Amino acid sequence: MSPYNYARKESLFESLVCEQYEHFIGLFQKAQQDFSNIPQEEQPKHLGDISDACMDEMLLYAYQHLNVFKLILCHSEGTRFSHLIDEMVEIELKGTHDYLAVLEKLGRPAPPIDEHLEHVLITGMFNTFFELIIHEMSLEKAQYYLKEMRAFYTAGWMKIMGQ
């Protein structure tokens, strides 16, 4: 497939990365939905279970399609695919707000979280995740770093949420 067959970068990227992009976002959306389907009183006990499994699955999927994800992460500027992190941040923000509402209902309200700080922290979390892919380290090393990253962010969020 020659890049000269495409009138615009957007249509070239559409043919090269769309399927994997949509699947990747779908994995993340499914994890959010699966967590929200847990009975509310059980959600605090299972906070990391689904998200940990999802992050593992997303990392493995990205490594299975490494060239595609390198295109998305490093060369998609000017296409809709350049908004991967922003799209994931929006999904995570909604999930976080839904969970905060559950904590409130359970009588375990979190202190108010500044919306800008929340956005910065979530964006930082996804940037950290995607650095694992950008740097093309071994899968084993990336999986280890992901485990450490999750422990780091989970501890921080638990502190901020007063849990």
Where are these regions (language model features)?
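Amphipathic alpha-helical segments that line or abut small-molecule/effector binding pockets
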Residues: E41, K45-N67, T123, N127, ...
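Short, hydrophobic secondary-structure boundary micro-motifs
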Residues: K70-I72
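Solvent-exposed, amphipathic alpha-helical segments
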Residues: H23-D34, V68, G124, T128-L132
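Amphipathic alpha-helical packing segments from all-alpha helical-bundle domains
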Residues: E57-Q64, E77-K105, H116-T123
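Short helix-coil transition/hinge motifs at the ends and kinks of transmembrane helices
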Residues: S36-K45, E104-P109
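Short hydrophobic/aromatic patch on the recognition helix
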Residues: M1-Y6
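Alpha-helical structural segments
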Residues: S11-N37, D49, A53-E57, H83, ...
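Hydrophobic/aromatic-rich alpha-helical bundle segments in the mid-to-C-terminal region
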Residues: Y99-F152, M161-G162
